[in-house]
Amino acid sequence: MHNTDVLIIGAGPVGLFAIFQAGMLGMKCHVIDAQEVIGGQCITLYPEKPIYDIPAYPKIAAADLIKQLELQAATFNPVYHLNQQAVELKKEGEFFEVKTSKDIVIKSKVIVIAAGAGSFGPNKPPLANIEEFENESVFYFINNRSKFTGKNIVIAGGGDSAVDWAISLSEIANKIYLVHRRDKFRAANESLRQLKDIAESGKIELVTGYQLDSLEGNNSELQSVIVRDLQNNTRKLNANILLPFFGLKQELGNLVNWDLDIKLHHIEVDPVYYQTNISGIYAIGDVAHYSGKLKLILTGFAEAASSLHHAYGKVFDGNALHFEYSTTKYTQ
């Protein structure tokens, strides 16, 4: 059995920053994550995707952000339990005991759930024989941007991922078709401005009012993507790559059995300290929900700070926390 002050579930960007915040307050951390490496979706799904809304970084690749967060957290020697899930929860007096899928037991006074989307996988389009092209011509995640150099690419979707990747890949691709069933995209205003400018240059063609219909090709090599509009008209897009970005399937695993207040795959928390309906268990980042919630990495960082300042009194038996700025608290 391991004993620690704080158990963090999830080693994505918000979980990593929570380690640092706990360390700044003198609290030791163990961390559980289902992936084989730390970083969450930033590493597993889009390590090369540029992120634009991290303070002091006009633009930073997801993998580089994780590298910096890992370095920052390493100061406080966290213990990682990777490639395993939090399975069982028990309360023993003032302590929680969590058992992992590898039968490791971790005892702590506080739990911080920073599980992001939980266990995740892509929402795949219902296209016949799409499996024949997967990992050769059809990709749901991008972990090596350079492989798309000079390609003709169909990107399907209307959210941030579709728009951001269309913008990013337009720098190296021969041609990009951005397919969306509506004529409006759901993305940041600055991204929409960039998309409009690139579309006007001809590097990206907006194919709106259409949905994916079928694929044509041989031996896992895609030759064209057929799209269909609401009037049943079809159009053939000559492309050798399809990138469908229709979001992720969220699975919270055994967390659903912990008597937490869960609605629509999100954990309800109070909007001040992000504590769940169970005292001593907090939820931060994308997995947490409250009125006015913004799903931003930046928001998760702030939630980590607030929740761990509140948790201090639970870890140290009601002792008052005297607030200090990091410049006086900690010097590298």
From Swiss-Prot:
Cofactor(s), names only, from the UniProt record: FAD
EC number of the protein: 1.18.1.2
Q: Which residues form the signal peptide?
A: none
> What subunit structure does UniProt give?
Homodimer.
Organism this protein belongs to: Rickettsia bellii (strain RML369-C)
Q: Please state what the protein is called.
A: Ferredoxin--NADP reductase
> What does the entry comment about cofactor binding?
Binds 1 FAD per subunit.
Instruction: Report a single Gene Ontology molecular function.
Output: ferredoxin-NADP+ reductase activity
Which family would the database say this protein is a member of? Belongs to the ferredoxin--NADP reductase type 2 family.
Q: Which InterPro entries does UniProt cross-reference here?
A: FAD/NAD-bd_sf, FAD/NAD-binding_dom, Fd--NADP_Rdtase_type_2, Ferredoxin-NADP_redctase_2
The catalytic activity, as recorded, is: 2 reduced [2Fe-2S]-[ferredoxin] + NADP(+) + H(+) = 2 oxidized [2Fe-2S]-[ferredoxin] + NADPH
Name the residues that bind FAD.
D33, Q41, Y46, A86, F120, D286, T327
Q: Which UniProt keywords apply?
A: FAD, Flavoprotein, NADP, Oxidoreductase
